Amino acid sequence: MENVVVGVESTAHTLSFGLVEMNGRAHPSKSSLFRPEEGGIHPREAADHHSEVAAGLLSSLVNEYKLNSNNISAIAFSQGPGLGPCLRVGATVARAMSIDWQVPLVGVNHCVAHIEIGRSQTGCIDPVLLYVSGGNTQVIARAGDRYQVIGETLDIGIGNMLDKFARMQGIPFPGGPKIELLAKEWKDNNPNANLEEISLPYSVQGMDLNFSGILNAAQTRINEGNDLGAVCWSIQEHAFAACVEVAERALAHTGKKELLLGGGVACNERLRQMCEVMSEERECIAFWPEKKYCVDNGTMIAELGRRMIQSELSTEIKNSSINPSLRTDHTTIIWE
């Protein structure tokens, strides 16, 4: 294998190494997920986990693909946004790899990487992105040389909301997949269920969203004695409908005809179904990459690094500091 970009992802609970060939062919990542024994993600504990598993994961990637300084074109890493201690681990590893192999270093925007891996894997060209993850919920579209944030959460990300609700019920991290399962099982057994029976707040404010209200209301429903599966179904229906409504408004506003799903919550089959129905009604097309490329992964970092290197963009070591508060629209886009 020749001419590859290696990507290092470490923004939150996942440390991941992936690679993409310069011709655009992507390869699965080597990843390790930090799972806290209780509560949510503790940044320093997650960073300790990343430090402990980094050497083994990287060695596995190097050995499988026979990587060396002769076939690596660049090292890309998540420069932000994310949890500071976690970002520092990935940045430190990436700098060491760049220096050791004497290849360019490329600091990339984690949010933009979700867009570019989605574009490359699905073939969509100029989509509206519904970006739904633990720490982020944004509706994004390209405008000139930026990916513009058209709408976003005003409090917590939808993934964090689902994980917090799951934790309140004693469901371990990550809670989203379990909520999806409980919701599906309950709905299958109650096909005529009505949302009015388990109503929750609707969280759209113009083009923005918030999820703390729906979280508190869902817990109140549990305290009132409602079935957990029923509340899981309701919380998904309400939260996803809000996201899809904002995405639909963005499609109408921009005139674009492609909707792309990205982020860990984009793995949810019910959300995909709702996006597909809405897109068909608008005569648009909904896209999403394979689930392994929706969750945080090193391959998406490598893909954005590849596009940047091909555009002659790289990062000097002295400019490679992490930026935990980096926003999607802070990155200038000069590639197609």
Regions found by a protein language model. Give the residues of each.
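Glycine-rich phosphate-binding loop plus the immediately following alpha-helix
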Residues: 144-188, 216, 220-226
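Conserved phosphate-binding catalytic cores of ATP/NTP-utilizing and phosphoryl-transfer enzymes
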Residues: 1-2, 107-128, 304
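Conserved phosphate-binding/catalytic loops in two-lobed NTP-binding clefts
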Residues: 107-108, 276-301, 314
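A contiguous, well-structured pocket-lining segment that forms one wall/lid of small-molecule binding clefts
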Residues: 181-259, 268-277, 281-282, 309-312, ...
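Glycine-rich phosphate-binding loop and adjoining helix at the ATP-binding site
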Residues: 71-117
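N-terminal beta-alpha supersecondary unit
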Residues: 2-81, 110
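Short glycine-aspartate micro-motif
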Residues: 3-7, 74-76, 86, 127-131, ...
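Glycine-rich beta-strand-to-loop/alpha-helix junction loops that act as flexible
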Residues: 77-80, 97, 133, 259-268
